[in-house]
Amino acid sequence: MKLFFPVFLLLSINACHQKNKQVNAARLAATTFVSTPINYDSCKKQILLIKQKSKISWAALSKEGKEKIFTRAVAETIIPNWIGTKWDYNGISEKPQQGNIACGYFVTTVLRDAGLNLARIKLAQCASEQMITTLIQPKYIRRFSNVDIAVFIQAIQQQGYGLYIVGLDNHTGFIYNDNSQVYFIHSTFVGTRNVQKENAAASWVLK
């Protein structure tokens, strides 16, 4: 079953593995927002508890209400534990702060641990477009090609509060709009070479 949560799919813009760009060291200094991790198993149990408590009233919730519950659970309970986890192109870790994790595995592991039934390994190894179109209904996918980062950020802001999967030519991650700031959350080789939560407008990868 495909997800009903909005997603933005970015294609044909600067990808994280482009080798022909000269990278300025200053631009690689992405800001990383580190949250204090709590027991990850407890996090997943908390997600399950949220779902159980919401089960009775879930059918009565609006689409927007369901999106907010899902977004809050993922962005504020699951993801903070992963910030700082080391990146590796072949990383397949299932535990935050242990081993390494690649960008695709970061996305699919977070979604799985948030309670979604998905093929974690298969989707993580797909191109980001294939992963997104497998998970998301077409009407919720928006494509951007060769647009200025300011245009993209404005589109996210207009969309409102939410957590979005973003796919580039050779990279994937989450865009999180908390209504005050738009963040790019991803496992990347750029800068600190780990899972980062950075200001999307300042992200070298998105530019």
What are these regions (language model features)?
Residues C126-Q196:
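...with weaker cross-activation on analogous glycine-rich loops/strands in unrelated enzymes
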Residues M1-A25:
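Bacterial Sec-dependent N-terminal signal peptides
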Residues P6, L116, G162-Y164:
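Conserved active-site beta-strand-loop modules that form the wall/rim of enzyme catalytic pockets
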Residues Q22-Q125, E129:
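N-terminal capping segments
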